[in-house]
Amino acid sequence: MSNWSSGRSLTVTREAREETGLAVGLAANQRQRVQSKTSGLQMPGVIYADSADKAARFILDCNQTRLPLIFFQDVSGFMVGKDAEHSGIIRSGAKLVNAVSNSTVPKITVIVGGSYGAGNYALCGKAFDPRFIFAWPNAKYAVMGPAQASDVVFTILTRNPGAERTPAELAALRAKIKQDYVDQADIRYGAARGWVDAIIPPHDTRAVLLTALACAARPAPKAGFHTGVLQV
């Protein structure tokens, strides 16, 4: 394994498997706090501008060298706030999404924890056509977290001035909305609707990925690799 970039909120590596003869590129977000040289302390499960930029260049490199890509997701999304905007999160995030969405090499995604919002897209969610999407049994798959989503839906439903409800009714409505969202974020809900290809035991991940790579890496894709305009 050659460590292409670590010490960031996203880690990308090249790895060669002697038993299969396959080399692959791995992209995964960190689930621990990281001390970045450029932007200080970075929180776990969030994509920052420097790591998005580095990952985008790594994905471009894998496409040039025709390396299959494996993404591991446990991500809440991109970092927000004034400091994140000053660091160029919009430009770097767009570059990462551009690189992932236009990749022509085989892509495989494994959801090992949460997969929320734009982070799902950045690490090759369903919309960007990975050859396979696998998930661990504990995985969550949604636009945003249950607390935030239930607040948004609750506000919309109670905005009608003609609908008068007692405090008890409002509390019951909020609780129902949140529970519905929790149920629908469960990976079994998504798997039943074809959002993932299989729910796999964590200890079988290696064997499943080796089989998936053997299926996905051949034949070589014929499409050329072309990205949109990238801001540098």
Segments predicted by a language model, with ranges:
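Ligand-binding clefts of soluble mixed alpha/beta catalytic domains
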Residues: M1-V232
